Amino acid sequence: MGRSVANEGFIRALLRKDPFAAYHFYLSDNNQLSILRERLAKEFGGMLRDGRFVLGTHAQLPQALRQYDFHCFHLSDCLLHNSQLAMLRNRYARRIFPVTGCTHTLSYARYMPLFLQQMWAGTSARDVVIATSRAAVGMVSSVFARLGREYGAECNGFALPDIERIPLGIDLSSLPLPDRAARHAVRAGLGAGDNDTILLAFARISHYSKMDLLPLLRAIQRLGRMGIGPETLHLVVAGFMQQGDTTPHVLGGFAKALGIRLHVIPAPSDTERNRLYGAADIFVSPVDNMQETFGLTLLEAGAMGLPVVASDYDGYRDLVVDGETGLLVPTLGPAATLDIDMLSHLVFDTATHLEMAQRTVVDVPALAGALHSLIADPEARRRMGAQAARHVRANYGWETVIGQYLALWDRLNSLPVNESALRSAQHPLRTAYADLFGGYPSAGLTADMQIRWSRSGEAVYRGVEQPVIYEGVADIVDAELLRFMLFSARKGISAGALTVLVADRMRQVERANSSAESGAEIGSGNAESALPDSFEPDPSVSDLSQPATGVTDSPMLECRAQALLLWALKHDFLERIPQ
């Protein structure tokens, strides 16, 4: 899949260039971290051993944001967690750094709410959607404009992420220029003579999620009427095929009926891919599907010295210099799609993509004309292919593209932001659980509620009894912090006073842990606890909302302290004092 290839290429190129002191990866769970750690060990073992990577889960982001001074956060897709990360950054981070994400497929109906999430007061001037093509820039701009109009005043005045265009790149080292002997061998295997022309279409073989190749077969049929017989042509269709997909069968039957020599090569390896590029004469890609946004295979073909005949569609038009590195074929799209729009959230995206693709016309006569001009003129093919190789290798290698990212992040960090406004912003789509579900329990915790340790709590404090702490709450229920809280409540104390004391202690622990930070994993347990053996609480402090002196982000720390207090009440380590 193009998305996976692009994301891996981005990370690999960034780490090879190595412009930063450390690289942090935060994934959803420890299983994903284990897989990533294995991959890093294979390709970047030295950096891993030197502590250049910090690996953590999403749940550890608040701790990491307080602990490290980040240059930027970059997501592999602009529709993953941009707004959620901006919320966490605004609340926890030492500074307002850029949050960026790259476009890939933009056509799924479920994406509209994800764009809406990014329209809020907490979006900073340093937050950017990185669109890979002019078409993607236009689409994302249209989405934000439409949402602003449809939601009216609720969105007016909300900040929007900026949109910058940076293309995807390719790993040029994986695309060596063709070898003459290998070219001859592959062509012989296909039954292609020296004077035959091989047309290569390399993409996911799917009429509903990539491109409909039947119009290409019709264009080849037209070539016969233009003096180029099918006996001199070979159409090679290569790429991933979904199990059970009937597309290859349909293509094969239609090609046979038209007398076209079709070779279908499913899921070729990288080596086989390069051999096919080297054996071909023209790369053809009449894409018609809005699932496509960029077009990595056009760059690969160009880097291998092939002229490209492609539809003038989406990101393709950015990659082909028409008349110099290849030829663009005009396309025609629908003026209205109300019937599709109304069903798009109720049917599979593949059905929507297919319907839209079948209303997107790649001009068959123009496609035939473009192919004819290159088939009939081998010198033009060689000239365009050589220019394509120069153009792609000068502009689209990952090492070049990564430089554009680094320049963007530096520029974004220099932009002014209203830090106080950002830190106070509340996302309108945030699920405020205490407010929304406050009617579920009999009552809520109050500041004047009097509590003390129970017999079980005293036993835990003295080490006689060990609490059972579920893995999912281990970040809140720290054993040493629990002992501190129990000791502080031994004589009786208000919930408000205990909350502030525990929050203040959390701040001290975090400062101690920050001073002991290293290039280890988040939560590795290397930093020692800074809790004292005993601490006399100040009973005069009783307001849950009162900030403890010097506490960074007191409301958040007090929220976590309340969580520990409630957990201790739940498990009978604290008890309420009857009034």
Feature-to-residue mapping (PLM):
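Nucleotide-sugar-dependent
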Residues: 286-296, 317-318, 335, 339
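Conserved catalytic-core segment of nucleotide-activated headgroup transferases in glycan assembly
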Residues: 171-267, 450
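Short hydrophobic beta-strand element within catalytic cores of glycosyltransferases
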Residues: 307-310, 320, 327-328
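Short alpha-helical donor nucleotide-sugar binding micro-motif in glycosyltransferases
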Residues: 267-270, 276-280
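C-terminal amphipathic helix plus adjacent low-complexity
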Residues: 347-488, 494-500, 578
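Acidic donor-binding loop of glycosyltransferase active sites
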Residues: 278-292, 306
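Donor nucleotide-sugar binding/catalytic pocket of nucleotide-sugar-dependent glycosyltransferases
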Residues: 124-181
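Extended catalytic core of nucleotide-activated donor transferases of GT-like folds
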Residues: 7, 33-122, 503, 575
